[in-house]
């Protein structure tokens, strides 16, 4: 294993994180918050370590292969979170380091699960850093690195494949580095449009920035204790629309920019994604209408916001959906599992995987009924290879096994089944709130240290699509041959 190239990547990540910490430091200066100085000390330390790692890793640095790419990605996200948590603990805003690490892993993985009972108790620089972590993690820190750091295309593809969500990673243009620049260009552009719309609705600049960062990364860290409940209907509607937009595969936007409208519209995953949102919203609207005195418009507004928030794994809330009827709650749990589109900033199993699994199951049933019939599985009018179907099936099996093991470990805390199960689903699928004690009106502070560590690992597993973390944790990875 080429450890030098891994050290080099970690060094670059530390330097980028140090540079990004200048932003919350600026916020602290503007609002005259003393806690902001802790960002200065941490960024100086991170910059020094990053420069050292870059120097050590840059000497005689050889090629990066798939194994190194997976390990570099997993370690980068862990280091990013461990360093990002330091300002919270050093300043005393989150006294226990494990809680601060939980908060930052939740931030960078765009989960949005929080250990804070009252977020408004944090200084603005800390709130800004929490929200910014969503924006950084949404598209991926290493995608950002590839957009600004020169790296060989062969090495870049291993990093991008290890970090990007979805069954496959395709090049939008011949050079991988150019693809990462296009991705971040689209990401940045959509974020700016959302900020402008917030400002046009009268929201303060600070709120507009933080809420746009959380929406873009489909993260869900709110800066108000009631999440989005106290914002205007206009702001809630803008958020509903943009949560859904950031849950779309970003290659769709690339097609639209290239005026390839037919490719965008014929995309199977996009059609399923839109259909799931529309059908789920209508079902929940009619189910909760009686709770809101038969007001269809009001029910539709909150159902649309919640469905968009849950399927994209954002986690913002306007209502405590844990109080909704069982039918609506079951739909939301299913949406937690399905998740957003591959190639988006959302989490979950991904719509594309669900489509392939369902079509593979349908083909298998037809084969049982008609053994001599050859049924080819297609997506977007193209045949899906047997290798892709096997890869998706393997991923699903691992997904179920890890979720089951996590539920078993978290259940040692002795909380009710709804709380335990949805805490795992909420973190593993990078959603944020679950049901029960960790629902929209609750938090994750009450869990034991062991449960918090398990949930932290689940957040990383979910965001990195299992394999980077599994390779990192496998003993055989570190054995000398």
Model-derived features with residue positions:
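Membrane-proximal intracellular helices of multi-pass ion channels
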Residues: 1-481
